[in-house]
Amino acid sequence: MDSGPLWDANPTPRGTLSAPNATTPWLGRDEELAKVEIGVLATVLVLATGGNLAVLLTLGQLGRKRSRMHLFVLHLALTDLAVALFQVLPQLLWDITYRFQGPDLLCRAVKYLQVLSMFASTYMLLAMTLDRYLAVCHPLRSLQQPGQSTYLLIAAPWLLAAIFSLPQVFIFSLREVIQGSGVLDCWADFGFPWGPRAYLTWTTLAIFVLPVTMLTACYSLICHEICKNLKVKTQAWRVGGGGWRTWDRPSPSTLAATTRGLPSRVSSINTISRAKIRTVKMTFVIVLAYIACWAPFFSVQMWSVWDKNAPDEDSTNVAFTISMLLGNLNSCCNPWIYMGFNSHLLPRPLRHLACCGGPQPRMRRRLSDGSLSSRHTTLLTRSSCPATLSLSLSLTLSGRPRPEESPRDLELADGEGTAETIIF
């Protein structure tokens, strides 16, 4: 399979879309470049498949204890696994055989699934970011376990991906590379000279430009909300004389002074939990990885169809190969980002190494109410009694738990109070 875009149209070297002005179809390829690509694709396939399967198996063991964030991570891992199996694997096999080996129906199905996995992965990331936006900026709407709105957010990316990928079925077919040559390959026929430019521009907007714009807007609002929350905490600290004196809640005058003039969604929940901020950081890193991996791919593709002077020789082919491989790397990055933020998702051997290499956890003292006190983390852990939940409370600078963050508040802060030893 060629290493160019998933909607290749012109019979150029390696079948890329980078040479709309090419006049002579090529029947050969750069074998050395193909060998390098095959090796890289095989590595990407192993890493993406292994990493995402590890995440799926770990989350699958939680059963009904899965939180909202668990569901989004699970489905994002599914979309990345789809990229590995429906995009990377066919591309690897196609590079090995050079020409497409299969009937016309298989040609159309492969092209459809390749773009579907790209749409699904992008839109699932967007849905997860929207969920984090709602959790931070509209917390009262998210004080619940996975509900109808959550499942709608998860189903929408799959549905949109299935619809937006349909043009692939009609554009691609098994056709002769050169009329009368008898050499067949899975190529596109747009019907109009402007077809490749229009289709590629629309796909770039739908998969990259518009989603990145929405992701940027969401994170701008999230950062703004967190800054306002920090302002509330700072004002409360100053009004309270530099710290909370007892386990009791701050006085009504303190709360009134610190929340006056702020939106109700900020004053209704006095703090954004550390676990929630951690999930925001994780999603933000995933977004950065997505942009870093796919920006070169779409930049080169747009350059090839909009610049008549774009190179159409070997240099362009190398650039297309590198850009396409960078896009595939995104499916490798995501599962390791999950595991980096959540050590419990690591496979057991890696988890053991992480435990041996890291600092030993502090001893926790059991409080009279059965909760656990720790100075560093806010974790929900399940005790030996199935019906009992013990909560580790983070302490303030004065060494005492935050009075306004009761165990119940922390459980409900992200709508994920039944999770087991997790940060989301």
Curated annotation (Swiss-Prot):
Cystines in this chain: 107-186
Lineage of the organism: Eukaryota, Metazoa, Chordata, Craniata, Vertebrata
Coiled coil: none
Function: Receptor for arginine vasopressin. The activity of this receptor is mediated by G proteins which activate a phosphatidyl-inositol-calcium second messenger system. (Microbial infection) During SARS coronavirus-2/SARS-CoV-2 infection, may recognize and internalize the complex formed by AVP/Arg-vasopressin, SARS-CoV-2 spike protein and secreted ACE2 through DNM2/dynamin 2-dependent endocytosis.
Pfam families (alphabetical): 7tm_1
Transmembrane segments: 36-59, 72-93, 109-130, 152-173, 202-222, 284-303, 322-341
PANTHER family named in the record: NEUROPEPTIDE RECEPTOR-RELATED G-PROTEIN COUPLED RECEPTOR (PTHR24241), VASOPRESSIN V1B RECEPTOR (PTHR24241:SF18)
Glycosylation sites noted in the Swiss-Prot or TrEMBL record: 21
InterPro entries: GPCR_Rhodpsn, GPCR_Rhodpsn_7TM, V1R_C, Vasoprsn_rcpt, Vprs_rcpt_V1B
One GO CC term, this protein: plasma membrane
Skewed-composition ranges (Polar residues): 13-22
SMART domains in the cross-refs: DUF1856
Protein name: Vasopressin V1b receptor
Biased composition (Basic and acidic residues): 401-411
Organism for this UniProt entry: Homo sapiens
Topology of this chain in the membrane: Multi-pass membrane protein
Primary location group: membrane
MF term (GO), any: protein kinase C binding
Membrane topology (Cytoplasmic): 60-71, 131-151, 223-283, 342-424
Domain of life: Eukaryota
Extracellular side: 1-35, 94-108, 174-201, 304-321
Protein encoded by which gene: AVPR1B
